[in-house]
Swiss-Prot record:
Function, in words: Promotes unequal transmission of alleles from the parental zygote to progeny spores by acting as poison/antidote system where the poison and antidote proteins are produced from the same locus; the poison component is trans-acting and targets all spores within an ascus whereas the antidote component is spore-specific, leading to poisoning of all progeny that do not inherit the allele.
Domain of life: Eukaryota
Record's keyword annotation contains Cell membrane: no
Positions of transmembrane segments: 89-109, 119-139, 149-169, 198-218, 232-252, 256-276, 286-306
Compositional bias annotation for Basic and acidic residues: 11-29
GO terms under cellular component: ascus epiplasm; cytoplasm; endoplasmic reticulum membrane; vacuolar membrane
Gene: wtf9
GO terms, biological process: meiotic drive
Keywords of the record: Cytoplasm, Endoplasmic reticulum, Membrane, Toxin, Transmembrane, Transmembrane helix, Vacuole
Stated family: Belongs to the WTF family.
UniProt protein name: Meiotic driver wtf9
Keyword Cytoplasm: yes
Amino acid sequence: MKNKYYPLRSSMDEMSAKNDNEIDLEKGPLPEYNSEDGSTLPPYSEIWKYIKTVSEDSSTGPTETTNPNVERRQEFKDSHPNIYSLLRLLISVLAVIVVFFTAWVCVNPLEKSIFGKVAFFVTIGITCPILLITIFCFFETWTQAVAQCIKVTVIFLAQCVKVTVISLAKCVKVTAISLAKCVKVTAVGLYNSREKWVVIIWLLWVVICYTLFLRSKFGNLNLNKALICSTCSISAALLLFLLYVRLPFWTLKHMFSGLFQVLGVQSCVVIVTKGLMHLFDKHIDATGYEIEASSLFVIGNFLFFYEMECPGALRRMPKSIRNGIASFLEGTGKAIRGANDNNNNIPLEETEAESEV
């Protein structure tokens, strides 16, 4: 049996073979189609029509995205042409007026000279009409440019403000951290240098207070409320510094707690002193203020030495005061209950005998 060779032919070849002798009068004769090449398609085939349609659609389609602001402006222009023209004219006139007043302010100092007058009339007679025509004709172009410029400027200013705020926040944070570290290092250094610096500061405070007392007693310095407030502040600041030095492990809450305790004790002394002075019908003169200042001075020294000898005593003071008050109230209650129990335990016979008598 002999093998027969049949050349491979596509469906396109068969269709072209059938239509070799058929000529369409409208389309003209078909060009030769090479199936081996495959680069060209029959011009009247369905595939060719589809490719042509797709290419036309892609070529005629929109290639750029339009701006919505431009679309709205175009719609307004098409729907209200007269109003749009009036707006263009009004904005153009306003722009020219701004330019005119700017030129007038610049030329006004030179109006006394001939050059100034000529420049002013040239600006009015030539520049302003040309500028008005230019602005009116190129209204859309320069308005878009101005809007874009304003937008870029606003964004730039917002970025500048944002960067400035962030930088300031970082600077404040770094400064606070640096100050806290400096205070910590100073406190630790003073704590490691034993107690000599604390004693030196205390002695300096004593000298200042005694100087104020002597000046007020024998000099021309009147001892008044300002000195009392300064004494309170000095003693409170001393205690606060003492807490930094002696107790570096304290937190800020504990430091301010000790500060308020000292101020509270000093305030109580001042109130009691004033109350006693008014009770005995004596005015608070220099002697009364001297008593108050001396009392505050003694209390400040007492708290200083107490904290030096017993570190953390002021921290335990509120608890001790609460325990003392609770113990006092509890003892008073027990005493009252004991008295009532003794009255209830009296024998009935004794009460009857007393009633008979």
